Amino acid sequence: MREIVHLQAGQCGNQIGAKFWEVISDEHGIDPTGTYHGDSDLQLERINVYYNEATGGKYVPRAVLVDLEPGTMDSVRSGPFRQIFRPDNFVFGQSGAGNNWAKGHYTEGAELVDSVLDVVRKEAESCDCLQGFQLTHSLGGGTGSGMGTLLISKIREEYPDRIMNTFSVVPSPKVSDTVVEPYNATLSVHQLVENTDETYCIDNEALYDICFRTLKLTTPTYGDLNHLVSATMSGVTTCLRFPGQLNADLRKLAVNMVPFPRLHFFMPGFAPLTSRGSQQYRALTVPDLTQQMFDAKNMMAACEPGHGRYLTVAAVFRGRMSMKEVDEQMLNVQNKNSSYFVEWIPNNVKTAVCDIPPRGLKMSATFIGNSTAIQELFKRISEQFTAMFRRKAFLHWYTGEGMDEMEFTEAESNMNDLVSEYQQYQDATAEEEGEFEEEAEEEAE
């Protein structure tokens, strides 16, 4: 089977990672002790993608849990699924990264990274045919961002031909823990652009807005935000976990979704949106789902898709429904909104259907879009970065760990380049083909 090794780093990464395992274990009929109690062969057909089978028929997540302080791990260890993880796969330090990217990437994290890689190697060696890695982390803190990106580059060195996929939580002033989040995020994006194959941008700004506006929660908690994240992660991994034809592994997904190697930052979406504890009971139709799924309010990245254009889109419908209706609705969206899809990639919307819906819903849809509008998210962080960097505010925390100001300048310009690249393809039309080829040739030289 084509296995995936899952890593979770830092407080946020471990919290959303733990939720992810709770949700998918439930979908695959696996209880908190790792025992299967399901009712459908579909649940077990591709169980090996995320789980190892241990003695006594127990299923163990192929997960490596990493943090620079013991706190979050302790809560995973005392959480509902505490027995399911392999005890050796908890790797943690004592010092913490103090929300400092440099500590995660260069000092504290660098000391712990080898023991993490030992566990990763062990998991990879027991795989029959490893397809790649997925990391859950945030970009605003110290461990998930700094050490997370360090792990990515180390794993890249050792497994250069495996796919690297991340679920990256992007910081927002609306849900902020630290004032230096823009620094940490910019330094991280600088790494992600070069070293990952696919990154799902999960934006705290958007999660907060969904909880506040759509779900009418006046004071959203991290629990509420993480509920949305787990629904989204469950949705985007459906094709990897259940039998099906489309985007059935990480590489096929990358081939369909990434037209240019640097532009691999996806905007996820989910429909129907429900708050924790009140999954809706009203019947949904395929047209409803399709309409909601493309709605800006359902995007997990705070960007207006209407301000940009889609390079590529993948949609995953779950539940019992008519394939014919799904195809008709998806074509309908594209025909009605053709100006929002670049015309120089024909058939750039792909759809998959899985029979098993998520818990509590009859049907759902998950959206993965590679939209040029994601530049708005990078612009937002870049502006906050520049405001502080211009005054060299808080820099001493980073230079004190051995970093150079030059690295900040490089990260800043790399992110600005990324924004310009998205803009370039947003403006591109099919007629200009010739000009592009010339530019590409110049760049190649």
From Swiss-Prot:
Assembly information from the UniProt record: Dimer of alpha and beta chains. A typical microtubule is a hollow water-filled tube with an outer diameter of 25 nm and an inner diameter of 15 nM. Alpha-beta heterodimers associate head-to-tail to form protofilaments running lengthwise along the microtubule wall with the beta-tubulin subunit facing the microtubule plus end conferring a structural polarity. Microtubules usually have 13 protofilaments but different protofilament numbers can be found in some organisms and specialized cells.
Expressed in which tissues: Highly expressed in testis.
Region (Disordered) residue spans: 425-445
Modified residues (5-glutamyl polyglutamate): 438
Similarity comment: family membership: Belongs to the tubulin family.
Protein name (Swiss-Prot/TrEMBL): Tubulin beta-3 chain
Gene Ontology molecular-function annotations: GTP binding; GTPase activity; metal ion binding; structural constituent of cytoskeleton
Subcellular location: Cytoplasm, Cytoskeleton
GO-annotated cellular components: cytoplasm; microtubule
Entry binding sites for GTP: 11, 69, 138, 142-144, 204, 226
Any single GO BP term: dorsal root ganglion development
Phylogenetic lineage: Eukaryota, Metazoa, Chordata, Craniata, Vertebrata
CDD domains: beta_tubulin
Cofactors: Mg(2+)
Residues that coordinate or bind Mg(2+): 69
Matches recorded under SUPFAM superfamilies: Tubulin C-terminal domain-like, Tubulin nucleotide-binding domain-like
Post-translational modification as stated in the protein's UniProt record: Some glutamate residues at the C-terminus are polyglycylated, resulting in polyglycine chains on the gamma-carboxyl group. Glycylation is mainly limited to tubulin incorporated into axonemes (cilia and flagella) whereas glutamylation is prevalent in neuronal cells, centrioles, axonemes, and the mitotic spindle. Both modifications can coexist on the same protein on adjacent residues, and lowering polyglycylation levels increases polyglutamylation, and reciprocally. The precise function of polyglycylation is still unclear. Some glutamate residues at the C-terminus are polyglutamylated, resulting in polyglutamate chains on the gamma-carboxyl group. Polyglutamylation plays a key role in microtubule severing by spastin (SPAST). SPAST preferentially recognizes and acts on microtubules decorated with short polyglutamate tails: severing activity by SPAST increases as the number of glutamates per tubulin rises from one to eight, but decreases beyond this glutamylation threshold.
Motif extent (MREI motif): 1-4
Stored InterPro entries: Beta-tubulin_BS (IPR013838), Beta_tubulin (IPR002453), Tub_FtsZ_C (IPR008280), Tubulin (IPR000217), Tubulin/FtsZ-like_C (IPR037103), Tubulin/FtsZ_2-layer-sand-dom (IPR018316), Tubulin/FtsZ_GTPase_sf (IPR036525), Tubulin_C (IPR023123)
Top-level taxonomic group: Eukaryota
Listed Acidic residues bias regions: 429-445
Domain notes: The MREI motif is common among all beta-tubulin isoforms and may be critical for tubulin autoregulation.
